[in-house]
Swiss-Prot record:
One of its GO terms (molecular function) is toxin activity. PROSITE patterns: HWTX_1 (PS60021). InterPro entries: Huwentoxin-1 (IPR011696), Huwentoxin_CS1 (IPR013140). Disulfide bonds join C54-C67, C61-C72, C66-C79. It comes from Cyriopagopus hainanus. The presence of a 'disulfide through disulfide knot' structurally defines this protein as a knottin. Residues 25-52 form a propeptide. This is U3-theraphotoxin-Hhn1a 10. The lineage of its organism: Eukaryota, Metazoa, Ecdysozoa, Arthropoda, Chelicerata. Belongs to the neurotoxin 10 (Hwtx-1) family. 51 (Hntx-8) subfamily. Hntx-8 sub-subfamily. Residues 1-24 form the signal peptide. Expressed by the venom gland. It is found in: Secreted. The keyword Kinase does not apply.
Amino acid sequence: MVNMEASMFLTFAGLVLLFVVCYASESEEKEFPKEMLSSIFAVDNDFKQEERDCAGYMRECKEKLCCSGYVCSSRWKWCVLPAPWRR
């Protein structure tokens, strides 16, 4: 009888401890995604995309010419890498 009571008490104490640990880690995890997203999407003047006179890879080439190293696909009207079968 005593072993059963002790094992029930230890099981209950283990569940309470597990609940406390999970709650603490969850409250820390709630702040982590916010911090991560704010650092990823932070606006920095050095990394802003600047306007170019040419279109880059997989950009429309109807109005703009493709940048050097790319050709305008006659089928899709996108700037793509030149390949032997596209020349």
